[in-house]
C-alpha cells in the first residue's frame, strides 16, 4: 500500500532534509544556497562526517508551506554535483 507524502503532512510544517555528499568545504554552502531559493530563512545546518571522512551528512530543517516546495527541494538538492543522496 502506497501512501502519498502530502497525505501524511499538514502544512505549514517543519521538514528536515538530510543531504549526503562529498566531504568538500563548499557542500554546506551549496545546500544552503539551494534551500534559500525555495524557502528563504536563517539556516544553521548540522554537519556530520562519515566514518572514513570521505562524505558529509548535512541536515537542514525548513518550514515547508506546501508539498510542491518539498518535492522541488528534493529535486534541486539532488542536482548538486557533489551530492550523492537526499533523504
From Swiss-Prot:
Top-rank taxon: Bacteria
UniProt cross-references to SUPFAM superfamilies, sorted A to Z: YbeD/HP0495-like (SSF117991)
InterPro entries: UPF0250_YbeD-like, YbeD-like_sf
Gene Ontology BP annotations: cellular response to heat
One of the record's GO cellular component terms: cytosol
Pfam families: DUF493
Family indicated by similarity: Belongs to the UPF0250 family.
Protein name: UPF0250 protein YbeD
Name of the gene encoding the protein in the UniProt record: ybeD
Amino acid at each position: 500500500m502506497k501512501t502519498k507524502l502530502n497525505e501524511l503532512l499538514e502544512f505549514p510544517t517543519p521538514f528536515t532534509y538530510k543531504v549526503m555528499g562529498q566531504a568538500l568545504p563548499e557542500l554546506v554552502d551549496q545546500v544552503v544556497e539551494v534551500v534559500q531559493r525555495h524557502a528563504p530563512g536563517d539556516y544553521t545546518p548540522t554537519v556530520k562526517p562519515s566514518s572514513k571522512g570521505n562524505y558529509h551528512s548535512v541536515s537542514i530543517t525548513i518550514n515547508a508551506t506546501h508539498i510542491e516546495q518539498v518535492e522541488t527541494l528534493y529535486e534541486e538538492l539532488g542536482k548538486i554535483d557533489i551530492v550523492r543522496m537526499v533523504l
